[in-house]
Amino acid sequence: MSTHGAQVAGLVRRFPDPEKRCGTAPAVAVWRIAKSLVLLRCRSSPMGIVDIGGALAHADLRTPLGLGLYRYGFRTIESRVLVGLLRRDDVVIDGGANIGLFSLLAAATVGPSGRVIACEPSPRTMALLNANANLNGFDVIERHEVALSDQPGTASFVVFDNASGLASFAPGLDGGKVIEVNTATLDDLTARLSAPVAVLKLDVEGAEVKALRGARSMLGRDLPLVLLEVEPGHLGRQGSSVEDLRQTLHPLGYEAYAIRGDARLVKITGPWQPAPAASPNLVLAPAARADRIESLRTPV
């Protein structure tokens, strides 16, 4: 990014919500001018910079993800839930980090004394993740170019040119390119942490069960809250099922919560399935972390 672009990005980052932070007219004016310059830059370049609420992100306007980010911002149901689960100084894992949007929000929430461990196996996507972390000066984001699995090694991985978030272990969706990537377990990645993992976010296109099986020691030790995607079709392509997911976590005392359209959590008393037409994700919470979800739960 040019020097001018870096200065503009710095201004936007400094005043993400100036009316709440200081309320001064000059600050509001600077913020509006800086944001306008960023938008002007986006229109003349395939790469833009977008304020996602608490952080900035590069948006590749040549891709559906980047274009959607530029047009609509990034305030998803899942991002609201993630921020609601986190506390200052937390350790959080972003498995299947893609370009790092959840990692950025997590870093902004946990602060400089927290830690974010971001895992993304696609080299092209990791390059954007690195750029996003550097854009914000988020040194707390520890980045690993690996796919999470139940054992370390290498594996065939299907990636897409548009950083769509659909990359997965082979076999994957049609239209992708197969590459070899390194795999790692969460137990290995977290073995030397000095603080417990508070929140684990997983969106690994059907490999969630593999990732959790590679995290048995960490899960039993830290009992983190888990936010993960549950797509039966994706799980089936990777040789697992929703029941496998339940059998992996339920013995550790985890209860499942569906996510409503208003980002509230509803306890699931039957099969572990997401709420229809809301979010394809579940929050899985052990009793030891029940206090973290109280503010997000619907009244009984």
Region locations from a protein language model:
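Conserved Class I S-adenosyl-L-methionine
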Residues: 242-257
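Core alpha/beta nucleotide-donor-binding catalytic domains of modification enzymes
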Residues: 123-126, 130-164
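Short, conserved loop/helix-junction motifs that constitute active-site signature segments
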Residues: 106-111, 215-222, 249
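Short internal loop-to-helix segment that lines adenine-nucleotide cofactor pockets
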Residues: 71-91, 138-142, 154-156, 164, ...
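S-adenosyl-L-methionine
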Residues: 1-132, 136, 140, 173, ...
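A short, conserved beta-to-alpha structural element at the edge of catalytic cores
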Residues: 121-125, 223-237
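Active-site flanking residues adjacent to catalytic metal/cofactor-binding acidic residues
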Residues: 93, 119, 200-202, 228
